[in-house]
From Swiss-Prot:
Keywords: Cell inner membrane, Cell membrane, Cytoplasm, GTP-binding, Membrane, Nucleotide-binding, Ribosome biogenesis, RNA-binding, rRNA-binding. GO terms for cellular component: cytosol; plasma membrane. NCBIfam families: era (TIGR00436), PRK00089.1 (NF000908), small_GTP (TIGR00231). Residues 10-17 are annotated as: G1. Residues 2-167 form the Era-type G domain. InterPro entries: G_ERA_dom, GTP-bd, GTPase_Era-like, KH_dom-like_a/b, KH_dom_type_2, KH_sf_prok-type, P-loop_NTPase, Small_GTP-bd. Pfam families: KH_2 (PF07650), MMR_HSR1 (PF01926). One of its GO terms (molecular function) is small ribosomal subunit rRNA binding. This is GTPase Era. The keyword Ribosomal protein does not apply. SUPFAM superfamilies: P-loop containing nucleoside triphosphate hydrolases (SSF52540), Prokaryotic type KH domain (KH-domain type II) (SSF54814).
Length: 289
């Protein structure tokens, strides 16, 4: 019996959260085509035959001087030391530079290199890309192609991961999907809805606080606050006649309902907290770093 923690590392938009959701066969992690949508670690628990893998989805590695982004990067780097093993995700469309930057961080734990989005390229291009990464074969334990669209890729990856786990009793009940508080998952789903319905800087200068969750017979009531930096942002989040916040609510409710399988009532308020994304204390309290 093996059990351990595996951090999912990669640049922004490499497909880390999509991979976690695919392995869980359930959506619990925020997914967006916009960069840096993942701000918090989230754990997903996967059983592979008799072994238990606790995946830790992390913010994407990137370069920024902004306080919020620096804290996100620190969270990802810290997870590299707190785990038993890692998987580094590299898109098949990218060159090897992001992986080289990861190696320059001098990771101490063993890692598997996962090539994502392989369904989007020809076999010839995939083989060419794998040959490029073979130059680093002394650094990784395995090079595994992966596609979230094809389940046949999952078992080989899980088997390789389990080889790196220590002999250990299960950390969690095998029936558990995640140990992440449901409030945090709901919060991320609402944030995903903001990313999908608003553009420019607004999603990056906004966050969400889930203030209260009330479970009743047949319905879960969620009361949440969207926090943003400027009055103009608040107006745009609400939209003309409340149309934008209505779309955000519909999008978020659908995500939450798909996870909980129950009727959802979602009440969203919007408040302005000027400079929150530049205040380390506020960020740590809000996001949980």
């Amino acid at each position: 019996m093996r059990s351990g923690f595996v951090s999912i590392i990669g640049r922004t938009n490499a497909g880390k959260s999509s991979l976690l959701n695919a392995l869980l066969n359930e959506k619990i992690a925020i997914v967006s085509h916009k960069q840096n949508a993942t701000r918090r670690k989230i754990n997903g628990i996967v059983m592979n035959e008799g072994d238990q893998i606790i995946f830790v989805d992390t913010p994407g590695l990137h370069e920024s001087e902004k306080i919020l982004n620096k804290l996100m990067i620190n969270e990802a780097v810290k997870s590299m030391g707190d785990c038993d093993a890692m998987i580094f995700i590299a898109s098949v469309h990218d060159d090897t530079s992001d992986y080289e930057k990861f190696l320059n961080l001098n990771p101490k734990k063993p890692h598997i290199l996962v090539l994502s989005k392989v369904d989007e390229v020809s076999n010839e291009k995939l083989l060419k890309k794998m040959m490029q990464y073979q130059n680093f074969q002394s650094r990784f334990t395995a090079l595994v192609p992966f596609s979230i669209k094809k389940q046949s890729y999952q078992k080989p990856l899980l088997d390789e991961i389990c080889k790196l786990l220590p002999e250990h009793a299960y950390f969690y009940d095998p029936q558990f999907l995640t140990d992440t508080n449901e409030k945090e998952i709901f919060r991320d789903f609402i944030l995903e809805a903001i990313y999908e319905n608003l553009s420019d800087e607004i999603p990056y200068l906004s966050d969400v606080s889930v203030d209260k969750v009330v479970e009743k017979a047949g319905i879960t009531e969620i009361f949440a606050t969207i926090i943003t930096e400027k009055d103009t942002h608040k107006s745009m989040i609400i939209g003309k006649n409340g149309e934008t916040i209505k779309r955000i609510g519909i999008f978020a409710r659908k995500l939450i309902k798909n996870l909980t399988n129950c009727k959802i009532y979602l009440k969203l308020d919007v408040v302005v907290k000027r400079g929150w994304s530049k205040d380390e204390k506020i960020i740590k309290k809000l996001i949980g770093y």
